[in-house]
């Protein structure tokens, strides 16, 4: 394996000059840079990334923590795509760490990325509380950004959407169109998003003067299968409804398929609304109405 000294000899410069060229630190003439890069290419030299990172205190990496229970959804595929593109545009590499199935495992994933010395970390927490996220941010100097949580003490370190208000808007729109019996398929109720969207549904009904009917509420798990199962549960309960809101587009897709299999026409007999405005939504037949959550 070629060494930096061999590169220096081939380029006719010192090891210090080769180091400056490869690290991008300090002035080196373009002619000298060209000779060094040519020598690197000819020799097949590969710099020691660990040594370079220790010297520059930069790894050119961005860490992302997402629990694997969320990988299956279209929304998270799109999220990962956009994060990867952003990282690529900045000339960096993306490192994905799995938060797995508990707050402790999410902590371990964050620590793993910190140990790798990622320049910055993005976290989409599934189990860690707001207070725990605030504590993690305050105990580390590395830039940490939290998605989909409204932090109490570190507002500049989070990006969040008002999930409750989004659900209220969807239900109020249906009420304005004349719907009174509106079914709701929740997301996982052990997640803040699932709880907030259900709360928005209930508040919209109350504001519209519509009594809450618990028989119209079915718990889902964010997947098309649980969306379809939700429609089947409503059928077995023998409750009527003219509109159905699913807490994400994946469940809405499953619900629409099950309604079709039951011979129910969408939107003529039942209007269906989802959340997240996935790329597939307008290509469905009929097109899926969806709330675009920023």
Task: Annotate each PLM feature.
Residues 69, 100-103, 124-129, 250:
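Short beta->alpha connector loops
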């Amino acid at each position: 394996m070629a060494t930096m000294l061999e590169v220096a000899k081939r380029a006719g410069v010192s090891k210090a000059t080769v180091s400056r060229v490869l690290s991008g630190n300090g002035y080196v003439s373009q002619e000298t840079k060209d000779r060094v890069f040519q020598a690197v290419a000819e020799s097949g030299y590969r710099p020691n990334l660990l040594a370079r990172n220790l010297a520059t205190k930069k790894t050119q990496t961005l860490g992302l923590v997402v629990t694997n229970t969320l990988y299956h959804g279209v929304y998270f595929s799109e999220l990962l795509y956009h994060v990867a593109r952003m990282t690529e545009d900045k000339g960096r590499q993306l490192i994905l760490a799995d938060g797995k199935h508990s707050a402790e495992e999410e902590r371990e994933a964050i620590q793993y990325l910190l140990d790798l010395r990622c320049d910055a970390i993005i976290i989409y927490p599934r189990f860690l509380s707001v207070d725990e996220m605030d504590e993690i941010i305050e105990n580390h100097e590395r830039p940490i950004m939290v998605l989909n949580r409204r932090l109490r003490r570190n507002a500049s370190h989070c990006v969040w959407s008002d999930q409750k208000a989004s659900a209220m808007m969807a239900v109020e729109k249906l009420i304005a169109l004349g719907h009174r019996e509106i079914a709701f398929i929740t997301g996982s109720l052990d997640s803040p998003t699932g709880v907030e969207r259900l709360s928005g549904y209930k508040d919209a009904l109350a504001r519209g003067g519509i009594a809450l009917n618990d028989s119209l509420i079915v718990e889902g798990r964010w997947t098309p299968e649980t969306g379809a199962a939700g429609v089947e549960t409503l059928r077995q309960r023998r409750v009527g409804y003219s509109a159905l809101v699913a807490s994400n587009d994946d469940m809405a897709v499953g619900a629409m398929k099950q309604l079709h299999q039951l011979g129910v026409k969408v939107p003529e007999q039942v209007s269906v609304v989802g959340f997240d405005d996935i790329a597939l939504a307008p290509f469905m037949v009929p097109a899926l109405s969806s709330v675009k959550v920023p």
